[in-house]
Amino acid sequence: MAIPSRPIREEIRSIAPYNAGLTLEEVRAKYHVDEVAKLSSNENPLGPSPALRRLFPDIGELARLYPDPQGRALCARLAASFDVENNQVILGNGSEDLIAVICRSVVRAGDTVVTLYPSFPLHEDYTTLMGGKVDRVTVTPDLSVDMDALLAAIARKPRMLMFSNPMNPVGSWLTPLQLAKVVAALDPETLIVVDEAYAEYAAGDDYPSAAEVLKVTGLNWVVLRTFSKAYGLAGLRIGYGIVSDGSLCDFFNRARTPFNTNAIAQVSALAAFDDTYHLNRSVELALVERERMKKELATMGYRIAPSKCNFLFFDARTEATPVAEALLRRGVIVKPWKQPRFETYIRVSIGSPVENDHFIHALKEVEAVG
């Protein structure tokens, strides 16, 4: 199978990879020395303030030294899990950082990027920042993917196809058959980026792992994941991408900042990834509560999109912003959607049972007041 050319901007090709030097671990392993004086990166020998050490007693060298710019330990663990090479994994300051990196690497002025709509706004925003044109494929009236419109958009040979699966904010998803049709229709020069921020919640045989589907295609592709949702590390800002091959991943690495994921985030993500018990508990809670919340909202007469995420997207039957404001006054924070054509919709996260009860009670109060 012929390897398609890389859809990379010439400006990125001309940038040499950043040389961050060797880490302490690399020097010890390569040169077999125990004591190493790291005097290459202008770090403070005293380390962080004692106030920080009181907050985090074991922070030590994690805060004093620059992190591994490649996040090698975490990348190796992720690569093994996805059965890819280590150099096919890239880390980001949240997966949204990688959306920006990919757009900086690929999108030229005038290029077309196909997205699903409504979707995560940054898919469109970073395209626009690079001078690209967004080709929206709007969901059907039942809030599922419009496959005819999507395949028609793909047939126009865009520079990139970027979408979330499951979709944020709707919650619906492409099935294995639908994803296979998308892949079969793609031009070899089109980069496909599947944002799987909510994949851990997408239980069932009707949800495909994009990496497993794409690995055998020979296409240029990226699958994005995050530690912010099911792994509970939103405040640490760390996500990752699985890339079709090391060569393409190398170009993306040139477009990111060298130390875009901090050392604490890297070690925390590695620990979280290996704690499958906690992950399973988190997902199970979300799925059970999602179904309970869905029934409650349906009983109240609301129209709810199908969801494989840790949230529900429902039609408030009136402008959503005033409803959200009324909920705020009752101590509940939800997200009214403001993209055109969906201004009556609210996205509500699945919280703890107590939080979810608080929301339902508050929504009933808002309804009663009118």
Curated annotation (Swiss-Prot):
User: Which residues get modified to N6-(pyridoxal phosphate)lysine?
Assistant: K229
Entry keyword set: Amino-acid biosynthesis, Aminotransferase, Histidine biosynthesis, Plasmid, Pyridoxal phosphate, Transferase
The protein's enzyme class: transferase
Its Enzyme Commission number(s) read 2.6.1.9
Pathway listed for it is: Amino-acid biosynthesis; L-histidine biosynthesis; L-histidine from 5-phospho-alpha-D-ribose 1-diphosphate: step 7/9
GO process annotations (BP):
L-histidine biosynthetic process
Pfam families xref list: Aminotran_1_2 (PF00155)
Q: Which cofactor does it need?
A: pyridoxal 5'-phosphate
- The domain of life is Bacteria
InterPro entries, A to Z: Aminotrans_II_pyridoxalP_BS (IPR001917), Aminotransferase_I/II_large (IPR004839), HisP_aminotrans (IPR005861), HistidinolP_aminotransfase (IPR050106), PyrdxlP-dep_Trfase (IPR015424), PyrdxlP-dep_Trfase_major (IPR015421), PyrdxlP-dep_Trfase_small (IPR015422)
Subunit annotation: Homodimer.
Q: Its family? A: Belongs to the class-II pyridoxal-phosphate-dependent aminotransferase family. Histidinol-phosphate aminotransferase subfamily.
The record's NCBIfam families line, in alphabetical order, gives: hisC, PRK05166.1
Q: HAMAP family in the record, alphabetically?
A: HisC_aminotrans_2 (MF_01023)
The name under which this protein is listed is: Histidinol-phosphate aminotransferase 3
